[in-house]
Amino acid sequence: FTGWSAKNGHWQFPSENDGTFVYRQSWHDAGPKFLLGMLIYPEQPAMKDGRDVLDRLASHPRVAKFICKKLIRRFISDTPKQALIDSAATIFRANWQAPDQIERVMRHILNSDDFINSFGQKNRRPFDAAVAAMRALGGDWTLRPDHSRSNDFMWLYGFTGHAPYNWPAPNGYPDTGLAWSGSNSFAMTWRVLGWLTETRDGEVPLHPIVDTTRANVPVANWTANNLVTWWCTRLLGYQPQAARKQALVAFMAQNGDPNTYVIADTNTWQGSDLKRHYNHERLRSLVALILMTPEFMSR
């Protein structure tokens, strides 16, 4: 791959500095090479050495198993079964020149019994959790440079240890639950999830939790049990285990009856009667708590 480069302001070509790919024939080692049992002949046409290497790797059986194992680990389980690795690798190799090669491999993996039975076996990494929360909360804001809330988010998110493109080794961030199950990883991810539910951009909430609740649960039905049930369905797709749901209901109800007391659509201080105390703030905190449950943090 000598000669494969980028236009990066090199001293020989200072005017070329836009980051695009460039092949420089004069930099290329045109001598013979030997790779994985294959002889690469000398003085080949431009870029053919590199393309021959890529073709050799793309068709190699160990490469097929390596990539398929990573895909299965990503989508199914931290400990992929060898039978599925082998069957996926067979499809990978049989279609190594097909334009839809990865699509065929993924269709095989996602239609497998291993995938069908994999619910809850994977943990969401911090990035997955943050993006899933934004999607589920109906956010409509875009991270962008020179924007205070975007900068706040990226600063806070950086403490999770999962900042995009920040892993120094070429193997990418770990994709196993153990790597992201430490107290720091969870705590920093929870901070991000809490921030997403509470933060405003000026006077506009980043995520319209109160408005979403109004649009989907009639205010006359705002009992603690109804609110928890609706938001669990929205964020999880199902109801969490009974003890966990009861804790969420108790938090939302405070000193009110969870089944009969209708929580007012207000946000005022009522310190002597907690069932009426900062109801909107409590609703947003309820949503944050659901996002922090094991049910949301798994997939």
Where are these regions (language model features)?
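Non-catalytic, conformational "gating/processing" segments within enzyme and secreted inhibitor domains
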Residues: 1-81
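Short coil/turn linker and secondary-structure boundary residues
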Residues: 4, 45-48, 100, 222, ...
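Acidic/polar loop patches that form or flank catalytic/metal-binding clefts of enzymes
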Residues: 9, 100-102, 116-119
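Flexible, low-complexity segments enriched for small/polar residues
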Residues: 60-64, 68-96, 107-299
